[in-house]
Amino acid sequence: MTSPVAQCASVPDSGLLCLVMLARYHGLAADPEQLRHEFAEQAFCSETIQLAARRVGLKVRRHRPAPARLPRAPLPAIALDRQGGYFVLARFEPGADQAVLIQRPGQAPARLGQAEFEALWAGELLLCACAASPTQALARFDFSWFIPALVKHRHLIGEVLLISLVLQFISLLTPLFFQVVMDKVLVNNAMETLNVIAVGFLAAILFEALLTGIRTYLFAHTSSKLDVELGARLYAHLLRLPLAYFQARRVGDSVARVRELEHIRAFLTGNAVTVLLDVVFSVVFIAVMFFYSVKLTLVVLAALPCYFLLSLVLTPVLRRRLDVKFNRGAENQAFLVETVSGIDTVKSLAVEPQWQRNWDRQLAGYVAAGLSVANVAMLANTGVTLISRLVALGVLWVGATEVVAQRMTVGELVAFNMLSGHVTQPVIRLAQLWNDFQQTGVSMQRLGDILNCRTEVAGDKAQLPALRGSIELDRVSFRYRPDAADALRNVSLRIAPGEVVGVVGRSGSGKSTLTRLIQRMFVADRGRVLIDGHDIGIVDSASLRRQLGVVLQESTLFNRSVRDNIALTRPGASMHEVVAAARLAGAHEFICQLPEGYDTMLGENGVGLSGGQRQRIGIARALIHRPRVLILDEATSALDYESEHIIQRNMRDICDGRTVIIIAHRLSAVRCADRIVVMEGGEVAECGSHETLLAAGGLYARLQALQAGEAG
């Protein structure tokens, strides 16, 4: 089948081909011929593209944004040009010139200036998102992500709100108690009335303390539950992200973004609820204050615009400085993780002083950024405090004037002053809450980098049946980035069930990329990858990977026992099965010499074991679930000759009854293969047996001569 990009030159359906490109970008299989057949009677206008998108599992929404808002649109998207054709709008390049990266079907990606793009674009976008993804581009991550968890605990949250409401009513009684004491008890010397009021006041105080304690407990209880649920959802999403996400980001940066969830949760379940409730209930206090004195109430209300004006001025400054602070903190986190992960290299090169200077410089930058945020927050709090003090002075001066004129009693003035505090204090707290909200907004933006990324979701994809082991690559092309060169170019390859195929070539020739496409770690830009005749683009990736055994150049071992590391894919495997896999990988002998044998606890990444020992455990782990397809990606390149000899000695048993793909630099590792594929520049340069390729005198023969010369 001809790939969609190749067809573009002869087929005018640019909208169809753009849809196919975006479907494959989202990990969905889309056949242009099939879509053309299904919608043959219609031209591929925007409406038809929407119908066809639904057929392949995409949601498409028409959108006509202003040019200035285009960088905020969820990309990539399909754009309509002024000639009625379509192209893919990939992204806006950062920088002052705001270059736009686009791609037309059948052409290489192109960068356009802003003016060129606006001259080309007709003003319409087709926004695309994977219909199966819970975090798709049409539903960006925002506060609504937390609604399901909040709704689940709505009864607890409702109880908190009810208690807060009762506490507000109790606080309304306090000024009235003081007014009665000052205007009735003190003036009339009514001691019995004072005793009754004191008992009632004491009961109110005790009841208020009890309700406050209950509310604090409910807050803590609800927060703990939300921590567990939201953290679990975030971690599950993180595990479902494609490999490309992690390759494009530093580990420390991702960890820093995950930690932002705590800030958001603290904001949602902290003072935000009570402060907002206090602000809403301030309307009741204001109504009561009007009953006491219209003039004094206007003095208090005159300060409210000042609070909001202060927030309006300082918020943009605070937001920018919070962005800088987060970026500095993420850089520190990433640098710390890099240092700890590469401590062997740091110490072996004796670059500790250089690393210390780098850390000191980055830490100083972070502290300076934090200080700049604190300065803005301090300025805001100082301004709010100043305004509140001026309000108190105004209330005292105007109120005293009213008392002297006998338009108010002293008790009423005291009660009014207490009521005004219930209005100004929530506003002051709201100003602090606004600062917290800006911090939360930054946290939402950073966490959105994770949660807005599409996942490898099974959705309605079919489960792959038990494999026989046939593999076919049909004119497959792939590039890691839209603006990068092809890592694979028009590769076609068939592997029969039970066949052992070696793949060799220079570094960067596309060997490992080939196996990653077979694992569906990446999705081909053009062409198809089929296993047992099934297009792996339309099956659940987990059902595929469960049936593959993969050994990389460096096997990662985890902080658990040797047995648990081997049985990672089959936790219920018997000891007999674990030992059988270890024997097959040549690991049983050295495992028995460990202090506790198979129950020996390994350090992080197998600290304490040699590279060859770690690799043999990795091979045993790949064999434990008896995969029908085994991929050895440079699995023996880092082994010493003795360890490699052990693996090669068992290779016949390892390959028995399964399809095996061996990626290797050492040609001796693939000499026993049924067929050897030679890669060069992302293409299949040669293919044949060891003897045939040597006789051909091509690239394989030259590589063989080079390695023979090095060995000599």
Curated annotation (Swiss-Prot):
Keywords: ATP-binding, Cell membrane, Cytolysis, Hemolysis, Hydrolase, Membrane, Nucleotide-binding, Protease, Thiol protease, Translocase, Transmembrane, Transmembrane helix, Transport. GO terms for biological process: killing of cells of another organism; protein secretion by the type I secretion system; proteolysis. GO terms for molecular function: ABC-type transporter activity; ATP binding; ATP hydrolysis activity; ATPase-coupled lipid transmembrane transporter activity; cysteine-type peptidase activity. It comes from the Bacteria. The chain crosses the membrane at residues 160-180, 194-214, 272-292, 298-318, 367-387, 390-410. Residues 7-128 form the Peptidase C39 domain. Its main location: membrane. Residues 157-439 form the ABC transmembrane type-1 domain. It is a multi-pass membrane protein. One of its GO terms (cellular component) is plasma membrane. It is found in: Cell membrane. Its EC number is 3.4.22.-, 7.6.2.-. InterPro entries: AAA+_ATPase, ABC1_TM_dom, ABC1_TM_sf, ABC_transporter-like_ATP-bd, ABC_transporter-like_CS, ATPase_T1SS_HlyB, P-loop_NTPase, Peptidase_C39. ATP binds at residues 505-512. Residues 471-706 form the ABC transporter domain. This is Cyclolysin secretion/processing ATP-binding protein CyaB. The lineage of its organism: Bacteria, Pseudomonadati, Pseudomonadota, Betaproteobacteria, Burkholderiales.
